[in-house]
Amino acid sequence: MLKTTPLNAAHRAMNAKMVDFGGWDMPLHYGSQLDEHHSVRRDAGMFDVSHMLTVDIHGENVRQFLRGLVANNVDKLTLPGKALYTCMLTPTGGIIDDLIIYFLSESWFRLVVNAGTADKDIDWITGQSRQLAPALTITPRRDLAMIAVQGPNARTKVWNVIPDSQAISENLKPFQSVMLGDYFIARTGYTGEDGFEITLPAGQAADFWQKLHAAGVAPAGLGARDTLRLEAGMNLYGQDMDETVNPLESGLAWTVDLKSERDFTGKQTLLETPVNRQLVGLVLLDKGVLRNHQKVITRQEGEAGEGEITSGGFSPTLNQSIALARIPAGIAAGEQVHVVVRDKQLAAKVVKYPFVRNGQALV
């Protein structure tokens, strides 16, 4: 039996194409993935992300516990409502999950973790807590729903739906959040566009979804969510990284704090392990489509040097095929590589990602 979000009936009422997404019954699209993609880039779209899990951690020493749990430094979180993107690592540096941490008070931090890793994450966090901070209370919030409203007009349309929300959220910077009654409003997202991710009680989600739709926000499914995040150069857990790779070879060095004296799980391995691979962007120069797991040839014939596409597909905004690929370190942006597509080697250019940000092509 597939798990369902509080919006399942709403998706079906909108004639969504439903698919099994990691054990969840989720909308792939509502008729046109392409239209949904463009709605987010040009206006406003909304995604049901209630399958992701909010985890509240309460107690006296939450900050100290998180200092050792994650690779980024939670001491950056000084302003209530501020958010931090980070990874949890295994002792050998592999990525257990990527997540967002919100600082709400010294005794209350909120984590948002991926759906497919939620059970594993809870087991890991509670296991670490039992050892290091047994007095903490760890609460998975399955009573909450989450809706992401994204696009250049997303915030304005949310303000039109939630009374008094503009005054309290208009001055939020990216990666800041605020509570407004039952709404937890965060200026975050997974599309490369502006917008909010809004957490609210599950019982209120369907009504809020309908009000957003009435305000001109287009529903968007997992298909558009994937093409948008790929254009934005944002990693997808299970494709671009997992426990077999570390953040330094996954384009996530910026989320790892190795400079402070603070210790965290996996730090020693990261310090001792040479970084032989890197995650890069690819733009296909020949005709064809880049797909996950295609082999990337990074050297001339006879020399070592192979990589693999981790996420690939067609970019509706750029109207060409793009990919994220893990290749040997030392290959610079601007260099040409070849991707093995069936029995052919197609030329591609290495680029710095993101490919698109705030509706504008960057490559």
UniProtKB/Swiss-Prot annotation:
<comment type="similarity">
    <text>Belongs to the GcvT family.</text>
</comment>
<dbReference type="Pfam" id="PF08669">
    <property type="entry name" value="GCV_T_C"/>
</dbReference>
<comment type="function">
    <text>The glycine cleavage system catalyzes the degradation of glycine.</text>
</comment>
<comment type="subunit">
    <text>The glycine cleavage system is composed of four proteins: P, T, L and H.</text>
</comment>
<dbReference type="InterPro" id="IPR029043">
    <property type="entry name" value="GcvT/YgfZ_C"/>
</dbReference>
<dbReference type="InterPro" id="IPR022903">
    <property type="entry name" value="GCS_T_bac"/>
</dbReference>
<dbReference type="GO" id="GO:0005960">
    <property type="term" value="C:glycine cleavage complex"/>
</dbReference>
<dbReference type="GO" id="GO:0004047">
    <property type="term" value="F:aminomethyltransferase activity"/>
</dbReference>
<dbReference type="InterPro" id="IPR028896">
    <property type="entry name" value="GcvT/YgfZ/DmdA"/>
</dbReference>
<dbReference type="GO" id="GO:0008483">
    <property type="term" value="F:transaminase activity"/>
</dbReference>
<dbReference type="InterPro" id="IPR006222">
    <property type="entry name" value="GCV_T_N"/>
</dbReference>
<keyword id="KW-0032">Aminotransferase</keyword>
<dbReference type="GO" id="GO:0019464">
    <property type="term" value="P:glycine decarboxylation via glycine cleavage system"/>
</dbReference>
<dbReference type="InterPro" id="IPR027266">
    <property type="entry name" value="TrmE/GcvT_dom1"/>
</dbReference>
<dbReference type="Pfam" id="PF01571">
    <property type="entry name" value="GCV_T"/>
</dbReference>
<dbReference type="InterPro" id="IPR013977">
    <property type="entry name" value="GCST_C"/>
</dbReference>
<protein>
    <recommendedName>
        <fullName>Aminomethyltransferase</fullName>
        <ecNumber>2.1.2.10</ecNumber>
    </recommendedName>
</protein>
<keyword id="KW-0808">Transferase</keyword>
<dbReference type="InterPro" id="IPR006223">
    <property type="entry name" value="GCS_T"/>
</dbReference>
<dbReference type="GO" id="GO:0005829">
    <property type="term" value="C:cytosol"/>
</dbReference>
